[in-house]
Swiss-Prot record:
Catalysed reactions listed for this entry: thymidine + ATP = dTMP + ADP + H(+)
GO molecular function per UniProt: ATP binding; thymidine kinase activity; zinc ion binding
Originating organism: Rhodopirellula baltica (strain DSM 10527 / NCIMB 13988 / SH1)
This protein's name: Thymidine kinase
Protein encoded by which gene: tdk
Taxonomic lineage of the native organism: Bacteria, Pseudomonadati, Planctomycetota, Planctomycetia, Pirellulales
Localisation per UniProt entry: Cytoplasm
Length: 211
């Protein structure tokens, strides 16, 4: 029986690169793949998945109201499909995650989903939350923080480089808006008060980083 796979990570771990390589491996063997990408992500143009190392492929865009089971079923009426790959899977809805599981169970087509686990506040995305619960296989794609530790979190930053703590969960951007960090540096950036927020700059109370 086909399985639902979820490859998760923070940003800059090569998720899209792995997706494109997986699709290439299928196609090299004469098999057909379908790449899905959320229409909200237009960093590289509509209907396209691209990696930071310069490779790209066309994709079929979807939005949160689309029925992905029906979308895939319609594609199989044109050509047989051997694998479905989903980029930026954190933007899936709970219902769409279930529909992808139906692609595996009803159509017997494996689904490989790639996405972020948590947002800039350390909270799970809707799609990631339900993929973590429903996927048959979970795989973490790893990258590193500037300190050398494994990076598991992401910070949203302003144009001036200041950490943004509040705002909408979804805001499309790349390295100019987000920084990949370990849990320690995430907590320091999010929870430690900036100097200009301290009530008394000459207070003898030690800062968190000095404790």
């Amino acid at each position: 029986m086909a399985k639902l796979y979820f490859y998760y990570s923070t940003m800059n771990a090569g998720k899209s690169t792995v997706l494109l390589q997986s699709s290439y491996n299928y196609r090299e063997r004469g098999m057909n793949t379908l790449i899905l990408s959320p229409e909200i992500d237009t960093r590289f143009g509509s209907g396209k998945v691209a990696s930071r190392i310069g490779i790209e492929s066309e994709s079929v865009s979807f939005n949160t109201s689309d029925n992905l089971l029906n979308l895939v079923r319609n594609e199989t009426r044109i050509n047989p499909l051997h694998c479905v790959l989903v980029d930026e899977a954190q933007f899936l809805t709970r219902t769409q995650v279930r529909q992808l599981s139906d692609v595996c169970d009803d159509l017997d087509i494996p689904v490989l989903a790639y996405g972020l686990r948590t947002d800039f506040q350390g909270n799970l995305f809707e799609g990631s939350e339900h993929l973590l619960a429903w996927a048959d296989t979970l795989t973490e794609l790893k990258t590193i923080c500037h300190c050398g530790r494994k990076a598991t979190m992401v910070l949203r930053v302003s144009e001036s480089g200041q950490v943004i703590r509040d705002g909408e969960q979804v805001q499309i951007g790349g390295n100019e808006r987000y920084q990949t960090v370990c849990r320690l540096h995430f907590k320091e950036a999010i929870y430690q008060r900036a100097e200009d927020e301290l009530p008394l700059l000459d207070s003898n109370e030690p800062r968190q980083s000095e404790r």
